Amino acid sequence: LGSKVAVVEFENDVHKSLEYALRLIGKMDDLNTPRRPVVIKVGVFDPKAENHTTVSVVDAIIKSFSKAPRIFLAESDNYRGKALDRLQLWKELFSDRVEPFSLSDDTETRKFKFADEELELSHILFKPNALVSTHILRGYERGSILKNLFGLVPDIRKARFHKRLDTLLADIYEAIGGIDLAVLDGTYFYDGFGAMPHIGEDGAKYRVKMNTLLIGRDAVAVETVGAILAGMKPEKMPVLKEFVKRGLGEGDLKNIEVVGASFESLRKRFASAAKTQRNTRAKGDAPQTWGGQANQVMKSLVIDGFFKLPNKRTVDGVTKAFEARGISTEDKEDNIAGILARRVKKGVLRSAKGPNGWVYWTD
C-alpha cells in the first residue's frame, strides 16, 4: 500500500493525539526542520460561521512543527472579508514565530497560467516551504482538503472559476509542488446544509461532535478517507476524480493503509452522526432540498447587499453568486430565474429588461 492515513480519536489533549497520528504515518524529519518555514493554509470562508479548523487543532499543528523557524497562517481575501481580518479567529496563537499572512497582499509572487488565465501566487506557497492544508470533515461534494487550495487564488473574484474548479485546483497543486501534510479536523462532523460553506452562524446547529482527526502526507488519500466517513462516494466527486486522473494521489480505499482507530467502527459512528443531523434538520428550519438551499442563499444575497444599487444583476451573475456560495447550479438557470421572478412579485427585488436580458436590483 502506497498511501497511509492516520485516523485518531481524542478527548481533551488534541496535541497528544495529533503527535500520535504523525508517528503512525512515519517520520516528519523532512518537514519539521530549522531549514523549512511552514505555511498552514486554514480555510475560513465566513468568520461568523464555525465551519473551520478549531483553534485547538491549529495550535496542535503549530506545536508539531517545533523546529520550524517561521510559521504562517495563510488565507486570501474573499467577499466575506479581508484575509487578515478573518485570520483573527486564531489570534491567540500569533507570536514572533507564528504570524497571519495575507496571500492577497503579497507583492512577491510567481505567475502561472491556470484554467486559461494568468494568476499570481504568493511566494510563500512554494518549496522549500512546507505546506499544510487543514479543513473540516464534512459531507460536501467538493471536499475540504483539496478545495482549500481555492483560497490560494489571491483576488476576491473567485466565483469565475467554479465551473472549472477541479481543473484549477489540480493545476495549483502541481504548480506549488503539492501539499506536504493534510490535517482533516473532525472535531465536529458537518453534513447536509450544515456542510455548505455559506451556512453562516447557523452552522453550529447542524453538526455533531466527533473528536476525530485524519492526517496523512497524501492529501488525496486523506480527502478520500474523509469523504467515505462522511458518507460520500469519492469516485463521484469531480475534484477527487481530477486529482486521481493526474496521478496526484491515491483515491481508492483498497490502496490506502488506514492506521489508528478502527475504520469500520468510525464509519458506523459517522453514519449514526449523519442520521442525527438529518433528524435535527427535520425538526428545525434547515432546507434539505436544492430549492430550499437556493432560497436560503437568495435571502442571504439580498441581506448582504448583492442586489443593492448601483448593482443590477443578471441571471448569469446570480448563478455565479450561487456557485460562489457552494450551491450547484448545473442545469438550474431556469430555476434561478423563477426564484428571482418570485422575489420581484413579492416586492423584494425590482427588475427590468435590458439589452442583455432581465436585470434585478434593490433600492
Predicted features and spans:
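Alpha-helix C-terminal capping/helix-coil junction sites
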Residues: V244, E323, L340-K345
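Conserved hydrophobic residue
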Residues: F307, S328, L349-R350
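Short, cationic-aromatic polyanion-contact patches
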Residues: R269-F270, G354-D363
